[in-house]
Swiss-Prot record:
Described function: Scaffold protein involved in different aspects of polarized cells differentiation regulating epithelial and neuronal morphogenesis. Regulates the caudal migration of the nVII motor neurons. Required for convergent extension movements during gastrulation.
Compartments it resides in: Cell membrane; Cell junction; Cell junction, Adherens junction; Cell projection, Lamellipodium
GO terms under biological process: activation of GTPase activity; anterior/posterior axon guidance; apoptotic process involved in morphogenesis; cell migration; cell population proliferation; cell-cell adhesion; commissural neuron axon guidance; convergent extension involved in gastrulation
Species: Danio rerio (Zebrafish)
GO cellular component, one term: membrane
Family annotation (InterPro entries): Leu-rich_rpt, Leu-rich_rpt_typical-subtyp, LRR_dom_sf, LRR_R13L4/SHOC2-like, PDZ, PDZ_sf, Synaptic_Scaffolding_LAP-MAGUK
Region (Sufficient for targeting to adherens junction) residue spans: 1-821
Gene3D superfamilies referenced in this protein's UniProt entry, alphabetically: 2.30.42.10, Ribonuclease Inhibitor
Keywords recorded for this protein, A-Z: Cell junction, Cell membrane, Cell projection, Coiled coil, Cytoplasm, Developmental protein, Differentiation, Leucine-rich repeat, Lipoprotein, Membrane, Palmitate, Phosphoprotein, Repeat, Synapse
Name assigned to this protein: Protein scribble homolog
Pfam families recorded: LRR_14, LRR_8, PDZ
Length: 1724
């Protein structure tokens, strides 16, 4: 029998080892210790060179990973791996696969890729189980001819080999679904390839195929066919048979035509025919109704078929680099088309019908010959329109004009008409992309010249340049900018001398001017301006890195935080009538491209000859602003544009943190720095001197204007006269302080102008708190004089020196511009209200709103009209607006525009006139009473440095509070399907449905100044993320953690604050990632708008101090990505307290309760943490625990929900989800200190040695057949409450285990969940109680689980979750687990008082506890290490057998036998009738395993904590013999007194004291029978009459009386048995627990080895345990015994019920030896 006892250490039961990326040079020796259990070994990515002999003794390996090593040889011993299923030896140096691999018949997945193999062994094709074979990049030159024998292959990868042909037997692989033959040298394919009926993917790319076999058309299941990069000149017509084909890749072949049969591919979704020789595209392409992507790049197509218009699902059409001269009008029928690329063709015109493709977002027509664009394209929502190869912005501004030939209205811009691209001539030789210079060195070609291919040879260069040549510079390198600046200056001087007073040009000159304009690289520098479409070299020059005079202050990048009006409505605006500029304007235009944008400042010019008037573009948008071509704009928007919005990308006021230096010498390259700043500040503007010239020009020509101030053009574009700008000289005195003046300057003679062409010195930056700011210096002031030094016409360095040498007192004279109202304010109304539209994207203008507390309608009280003029500073205007037509109303019933917020410290705040709630009447003279919100935004974000506002203030207005008062922000609007709610960004921001709630929570603006460190906060929530416990009814982004003394904490932020905005970015509806990005933006200053939402209910911080050695005593449930801890909200990922132990610091503290939510532990926020992480944090908390908690859920309500019939309380337990329950509930009291662990390990070692001896003794004394009798000493010493019975399942309902389950093997939780160490264990005190295998029954009714209500196991045991007893009912190593059995819980008694063995004779009781120890013969016996010699063992067995038989005869002849058998027969019948039994005064409910109502697995009570699979466990079965590899079976088996045995079929109750004294077991039985006959419910009442102490005293008294009667008669036999055991112990070192073996174990019930880990655990939902259930687990008193269970590991689970077993014992039958099937009733 010793061969069945595993004598190796229990920690050697390991199933999986992962040693990847461990830099191993040899296989670790420890792995060989696991040779009997190891199933998965991963040694990938190490430096192994060889595999030693012992490695191949790991016979049970099922998965072996050795990839990415340096293994040079695979030994033939690999044949030992007969169980191997998955083998990965890819990327090694193995040159040959051994022939013996054919013996690995279990192999299903093999990867040999990346080895220098040249052939496969002959026996390789015998691996008939192989399903997935990878042989990529192994230099194979041929495949075995019999490869068809691998009939189960599903995937075959042969990429990057040297295969020239394929064997015909390949057609036998009928299960093959994926065949990859890419990157070989195949020249022809076998016809048999078409005989693979299940083939779904066929990869033949990068071969040398010149044709495809027609049989390929038989592949009816084929989904993807890739034959790109071959030599195909045609496709077979049979390709129409590929009816399931979705992807057809034909790139880089020699195809000239596609077969008409391609139209039969109805499921075709992607067709790529790029880089072929197609000259014609078949009309049948239109029949491919599911086609979404059609790539025809680089062919010879001259036209497209009209049938393309039938492709309603086509989203991407690319016909770049062909020879198209026209596009079919039917293309507009492609209603789903998103991207249309026609680059580098010969198109002269686009059809207007393209506008019908309403989903078109990107149109690329660069490199064509377009004269103009159809006017209908204005209706498209384009995001990108590419007209030139080096166009810097995706969108341009267009104007309308009449086509000279057709008279139709068309669109044009400065890039039209197009110049033909030279790449057309090189179409077949190279692509434009390849010709594009990619080098970054300074010698690269910086000029790209385009010439007309037909005429440039005949014309001289100058003529060609004037008429045809478009010379465009490539994007300059910063080092080139200085040189370019000088060139620009020369050009500017030439321009001034050439045309000083010219008023207008001839048409030829105009054309030359426009060509010259194009010559100056409008678009080559995308980064130099935020909003202009062109970028002149002088602007590029500005881009060189420079530094600012920063006075030691950190410069900050910020996007107009106070002025939160960010975007105008993204539209492209057109003026039908050209606006011609003459005179100085033309000089400006020619010399500075940005003036091309600013030309819109002129409202009307004198009438000029209109024969060839050219259009001037307006306001090209920056690609970041979501501008797109759309419907014609509202005239008010155009008014705003003409008013001053047209050049909003140039700001003098931005700051960057780069290149900071102290001292004024930083000013030298100030202009460069400022221009760079514009990249980050698209809405900070400046007024150019060019604008002044424009305005002066318009004033000079005012007599020529037919209408003063306003006019309309033919497309209803409202043209408004801009406000006048006056200049005034100011003298300011500054007292210098240490650190500088606090200003930066830009400009100067010879430097890039700061404004237009004005080469004066300008103030480009003013530090807020600096001396200059206090003296009144403002950004944009022109510096005329410093301390008497005249700076008119001075160079930059002269000004720097003047400022540097100015001393402590600086007197400077500046020229400042101010806005003057236009003479006639114009009221505008929408001319075509039907054109209202809302852009598709939500704009992020972030306008906060004030909400009146009572949401009043428009007040009719007296109004006070106020006017103010605000000067835009570096942070904008400093206020926000809300309301307007088409937007969310600021006040109910009032469509007006109101001041909704005033930024503290901003321009409006310092002006101290505007107040929150003021109604805006006009902006810069434009009436706003009936205006839309976006129109007001457009006016406010114009480039004008001053904004004149007229507002009305109601005397009783709530908004009339101090401007310092932080206005409230409304809650997010309700969901709506209306376009206003769906599309409008600004319109989203004020919803007043919840106005009363809004005022309850104050709103504050908090500014965080980054100092290089973190912000000190964490957030939770977002539109795509749960934000529990914050904002459950109103989702949003919340602060979930504030680090003490961090930046956020110092700024007053607290946990629970709702973040409404960050740097003007609205986060009310933002996703979590958007909020994170906003907070992590590269800004020095983070401005946050937060709403002080109330804290979650019950939020408090508690501090718990643990006493030395004391455990915290709580269990938790929930966590992210796991099972929800809140039974009322499945989306709640919070961490909740699921249990508070009665023994622990938490219970002593008294403030923690079940159901509470834990927000923080120490400084660690648990929000968003997984369950495992939360457990780890709690365990690492130390002796002093600081917790932030709040109310969670009501455990009483939760228990009612979970106990409801028909409700699956936990999907894991019900087998719905395969999940480890440890992820849902864990005790936090599991970590031990290293010292404690060391002590525990020593104890385990002792227990292990003892258990091995005990097993031997069990075999010696049992002889595998006879029942083992208990000696009287053991029976007398052990209290009867500690005796346990091994339950047997009834034969009629067999114990079922469907299949071995190993899922739990890899759970890190399982490895801990079953470790049960008793606290304060003192084995020395147990001398009076010989350690044995008797275990106290848990006096707790196990919680029922719905999992097993069907009475049988799930057909698929993998669907069962782990039974959670091990994880939820025990807090390991916790004192609360050692609850004394003297304290039964009053909650647990069950109304079941029944028979008690206390009335039986002692002999009968002893027979009742006899255990048959049966041998279970394994299929493949494994060698066991015997610690006892064979001779001694044989003698001991014989002696013990004689004694046992003698004792059996004596007991059979006992005088009371017949009477007891009669009583027992009655008792068995009664127990069967009532299903209950009383043992030792404890009543048990006997449940049959197979019954439909059974809710527990009736497994032996002291089996380990892993149940058979039918109990809902993913643990191992006893049949399989292989268990949870990471489970510590020592603790499972030997610390069972710690474990509640709630899985037994016996449910204890406690009968009360009877009225009359009972002194025998029979008398007690008779009394209980009487009680049952009278009133069964009395058992509960009687049980409650006695206190626990009284019950124990009564039971002890009865036991003492019953024991005394039989002690003498057994004394002799017991002594003899102990002598035999003592003899076997001689010479052996005895551990503390070696006394276990001194008496034969009275109840050697099986405590399995790890391979037979069947546990008594209830199948209870994790987290669904009733709150007190775990506390009601009672154990034997610590002083009574420290017993451990020791068993024969091969004992099968008996399949008879406890009732039948009692009958068996009474009849003295012996159960048949041998292995019993768990699938059928066990014969008796």
């Amino acid at each position: 029998m010793l061969k069945c006892i595993p004598l190796w250490r229990c920690n050697r039961h390991v199933e999986s080892v992962d040693k990847r990326h461990c830099s191993l040079t040899a296989v670790p020796d420890e792995i060989y210790r696991y040779n009997r259990s190891l199933e998965e070994l991963l040694l990938d990515a190490n430096q192994l060179r060889e595999l030693p002999k012992p490695f191949f003794r790991l016979h049970n390996l099922r998965k072996l990973g050795l990839s990415d090593n340096e293994i040079q040889k695979l030994p033939p011993d690999v044949a030992n791996f007969t169980q191997l299923v998955e083998l990965d030896i890819s990327r090694n140096d193995i040159s040959e696969i051994p022939e013996n691999i054919k013996f690995c018949q279990s192999l299903e997945i093999a990867d040999f890729s990346g080895n220098p193999l040249t052939r496969l062994p002959d026996g390789f094709t015998q691996l008939r189980g192989l399903a997935h074979l990878s042989l990529n990049d192994v230099s194979l030159q041929s495949l075995p001819n019999d490869i068809g024998n691998l009939s189960n292959l599903v995937t075959l990868e042969l990429r990057e080999n040297l295969l020239k042909s394929l064997p015909s037997s390949l057609s036998f692989l009928v299960k093959l679904e994926q065949l990859d033959l890419g990157s070989n040298v195949l020249e022809v394919l076998p016809d048999t390839l078409g005989a693979l009926p299940n083939l779904r993917e066929l990869w033949l790319d990068r071969n040398q195929l010149s044709s495809l076999p027609p049989e390929l058309g038989n592949l009816r299941q084929l989904v993807c066919l890739d034959v790109s990069e071959n030599r195909l000149s045609e496709l077979p017509t049979e390709i129409s048979g590929l009816i399931a084909l979705t992807d057809l890749l034909l790139s880089e072949n020699l195809l000239e035509i596609l077969p008409d049969s391609i139209g039969s591919l109805k499921k075709l979704s992607i067709l790529k025919v790029n880089q072929n020789r197609l000259v014609h595209l078949t009309d049948s392409i239109g029949e491919c109704e599911n086609l979404t992507e059609l790539m025809l790049t680089e062919n010879l197509l001259q036209s497209l078929p009209r049938s393309l218009g039938k492709l309603k699902k086509l989203t991407n059409l690319n016909v770049d680099r062909n020879r198209l001269s026209s596009v079919p009008a039917e293309l507009g029928g492609c209603v789903s088309l998103n991207v249309l690329s026609l680059r580098d063709n010969r198109l002269g015109k686009l059809p207007p019908e393209l506008a019908n493709a309403t989903e078109l977002h990107v149109l690329d027509v660069a490199g064509n010959r377009l004269q103009n664009l159809p006017f209908a394209l204005a209706n498209l929502n384009l995001k990108a329109m590419w007209l030139a190869e080096n166009q810097s912005q995706p969108m341009l501004k267009f104007q309308t004009e009449d086509d000279e030939q057709t008279g139709e209205k068309v669109l044009t811009c400065y890039l039209l008409p197009q110049q033909p691209s030279s790449s057309l001539e090189n179409l077949l030789e190279r692509s434009v992309d390849e010709a594009w210079p990619t080098d970054t060195n300074l010698n690269r070609v910086s000029v790209i010249q385009f010439r007309d291919d037909s005429k440039h040879e005949e014309e001289d260069d100058e003529t060609a340049a004037d008429k045809r040549g478009l010379q465009r510079r490539a994007t300059p390198h910063p080092s080139e900018l200085k040189v370019m600046k000088n060139v620009i200056e020369a050009r500017r001087n030439e321009a001034y001398t050439a045309r000083p007073d010219e008023d207008l040009e001839s048409p030829d000159a105009e054309e030359k001017r426009l060509s010259g304009l194009s010559n100056q690289s409008h678009d080559s520098q995308a980064s130099s301006s935020t909003t202009s479409a062109t970028s002149h070299e002088d602007k590029q020059g500005i881009n060189s890195t420079g530094v600012e005079l920063n006075d030691g202050q950190v410069q900050e990048e910020e996007d107009l935080d106070e002025m939160e009006v960010e975007y105008t409505e993204p539209t492209v605006h057109f003026a039908e009538e050209p606006i011609i500029r003459g005179g100085d304007e033309d000089d400006d235009y020619d010399n500075d491209d940005d003036d091309a944008e600013r030309s819109d400042e002129v409202s009307q010019t004198p009438s000029f000859p209109a024969e060839k008037q050219r259009l001037i573009r307006k306001d090209t948008p920056h690609y970041k602003k979501h501008f797109k071509i759309t419907k014609l704009p509202k005239p008010e928007t155009v008014a705003a544009l003409l008013q001053g919005f047209s050049h909003d990308g140039l700001s003098p006021t931005a700051h960057t943190p780069e290149n900071e230096r102290d001292g004024e010498d930083d000013e030298e390259e100030e202009e460069d720095e400022d221009e760079e700043d514009d990249l980050h500040t698209p809405f900070q503007h400046r007024l150019d001197a060019a604008e002044l010239e424009d305005i002066r020009m318009s004033q000079m020509n005012s007599s020529l204007q037919p209408v003063k101030g306003v006019s309309f053009d033919q497309v209803n574009n409202l043209l408004i006269e801009p406000a006048r700008i006056e200049e005034e000289e100011l003298t300011l005195s500054i007292l210098r302080q240490t650190g500088g003046l606090g200003i930066s300057i830009a400009g100067g003679k010879g430097s890039t102008p700061y404004k237009g062409d004005d080469e004066g010195i300008f103030i480009s930056r003013v530090s807020e708190e600096g001396p200059a700011a206090r003296a009144g210096v403002k950004v944009g002031d022109k510096l005329l004089e410093v301390n008497g030094v005249d700076l008119h016409g001075a160079e930059h360095h002269t000004a720097v020196e003047a400022l540097r040498n100015s001393g402590a007192a600086v007197v400077m004279t500046v020229l400042r511009e101010r806005m003057v109202e236009p003479e006639n304010a114009i009221t505008t109304t929408p001319l075509r209200p039907e054109d209202d539209y809302f852009p598709r994207e939500r704009r992020s203008s972030g306008l906060p709103f004030l909400l009146d507390p009572d949401c009043p309608a428009v007040s009719t009280g007296p109004a006070q009209r106020l006017a103010t003029c605000l000067i835009r500073n570096d942070k904008g205007l400093g206020f926000s607006i809300a309301g307007g037509k088409g937007s969310t109303l600021y006040r109910v019933g009032d469509t007006g525009i109101f001041i909704s917020r005033i930024a503290e410290g901003g321009a409006a705040h310092r002006d101290n006139i505007l107040q929150v709630g003021d109604r805006v009447i006009s902006i810069n003279g434009v009436d706003m009473t009936e205006a839309r919100h976006d129109q007001a935004v457009a006016l406010l974000t114009g480039t004008s440095p001053t904004i004149t506002l007229v507002v009305d203030r109601e005397q009783s207005s709530v908004g009339g509070a101090s401007p310092r008062t932080r206005p409230h922000s409304p809650p997010p609007p309700e969901p709506s399907d209306s376009p206003e709610q769906e599309d409008g960004g600004d319109e989203h921001l004020g919803n007043h449905l919840n106005c009363p709630m809004e005022d309850e929570y104050p709103i504050e603006e908090v500014t965080l100044i980054k100092a290089g460190g973190p912000l000190g906060l964490s957030i939770v929530g977002g539109s795509d993320h749960a934000s529990h416990p914050f904002g459950i009814n109103e989702p949003g982004v919340f602060i979930s953690k504030v680090i003490p003394n961090g930046l956020a904490s110092q700024s007053g932020l607290r946990v629970g604050d709702r973040i409404l905005e960050v740097n003007s970015i609205d986060l009310r509806h933002a996703t979590h990632q958007e909020a994170v990005r906003a907070l992590l933006s590269n800004k020095q200053e983070i401005r946050m708008l937060v709403r002080r939402d109330p804290s979650p209910p019950g939020m408090q911080e508690i501090v718990i101090h643990k006493q030395p050695g004391e455990k915290l005593g709580i269990s938790i449930r929930g966590g992210a990505k796991g099972h929800a801890g809140n039974p009322f909200d499945p989306t709640d990922e919070g961490i909740f307290i699921s249990k508070v132990s009665s023994n622990g610091a938490a219970a002593r503290d008294g403030r923690l309760r079940v159901g509470m939510r834990i927000l923080e532990v120490g400084n660690n926020s648990l929000l968003g943490m997984t369950h495992t992480e939360a457990v780890r944090v709690l365990r690492a908390s130390g002796d002093s625990l600081v917790m932030l908690i709040c109310d969670g859920f009501d455990p009483k309500s939760a228990s009612t929900i979970e106990a409801s019939p028909g409700v699956i309380a936990n999907p894991f337990a019900a087998g719905i989800v395969r999940k480890n329950s440890m992820e849902s509930i864990s005790s936090v009291d599991r970590d031990l200190s290293p010292e404690e662990i060391d002590i525990m390990q020593k104890e385990v070692e002792m227990v292990r040695e003892t258990s091995q001896w005990e097993r031997e003794e069990m075999e010696k004394v049992s002889l595998s057949s006879g029942p083992l009798k208990l000696d009287y000493k053991t029976l007398a010493a052990l209290p009867t409450t500690s005796l346990q019975k091994v339950n047997r399942a009834s034969p009629s309902e067999p114990f079922r285990i469907d299949s071995p389950v190993r899922d739990a093997a890899h759970s890190p939780h399982n490895s801990q969940s079953n470790i049960h160490f008793p606290s304060n264990a003192n084995t020395k005190d147990n001398a009076s109680t010989k350690p044995g295998a008797i275990q106290p029954l848990s006096r707790v009714r196990p919680p029922v689980s719905p999992a097993s209500q069907d009475g049988h196991s799930s057909p698929n045991p993998f669907q069962h979750g782990l039974s959670p007893i091990n994880s939820q009912t025990t807090d390991l190593y916790s004192p609360r687990n050692n609850v004394s059995a003297k304290q039964p819980s009053p909650e647990t008694p069950s109304p079941l008082g029944r028979h008690s063995p206390e009335q039986r004779s002692f002999k009968d009781r002893q027979k009742y506890f006899e255990i048959d120890v049966k041998q279970q013969t394994p299929d493949k016996p494994k060698p066991r290490i015997s610690l006892v010699g064979e001779d001694d063992l044989k003698k001991m067995k014989e002696e013990e057998a004689k004694r046992i038989e003698q004792r059996a005869r004596e007991f059979m002849l006992d005088e009371d036998e017949e009477e007891e058998e009669e009583d027992l027969a009655k008792q068995v019948a009664h127990m069967k009738a009532h299903g209950k039994v009383v043992l030792d005064g404890v009543e048990y409910k006997v449940e049959s395993l197979g019954s439909p109502t059974s809710r527990q697995c009736a497994t032996p009570p002291n089996y380990s904590a892993t149940p058979p699979s039918h109990c809902g466990s993913s643990g191992p079965s006893s049949i399989d013999g292989k268990g949870d590899s990471q489970r510590n079976s020592v603790e499972d088996s030997f610390r069972l007194e710690q474990r509640p045995n709630s899985m037994t079929g016996l449910i204890p109750v406690y009968p009360g004291e009877s009225a009359a004294p009972i002194r025998t077991a029979k008398a007690e039985r008779r009394h209980q029978d009487r009680l049952r006959m009278q009133s069964p419910e009395l058992t509960v009442a009687l049980d409650k009459e006695l206190s626990p102490a009284e019950k124990r005293a009564l039971e002890a008294e009865k036991r003492a009386m019953w024991r005394a009667a039989r002690m003498k008669s057994l004394e002799q036999d017991a002594l003899k048995a102990q002598m035999v055991i003592a003899k076997s112990k001689e010479g052996k070192k005895r551990g503390t627990l070696d006394q276990l073996s001194e008496s034969p174990s009275p109840a050697p019930t099986p405590s399995p080895t790890p391979m037979e880990d069947i546990s008594p655990r209830t199948v209870t939902s994790p987290g669904r345990l009733s709150p007190g259930a775990a506390d009601d687990v009672h154990f034997m008193d610590e002083s009574s015994s420290n017993a451990v269970s020791v068993i024969d590991p091969e004992v099968p689970v008996a399949a008879t019920s406890a009732l039948e077993e009692m009958a068996l014992y009474s009849n003295k039958r012996k159960l048949r030896q041998g292995r019993r099937s768990l699938e059928a009733p066990v014969p008796t």
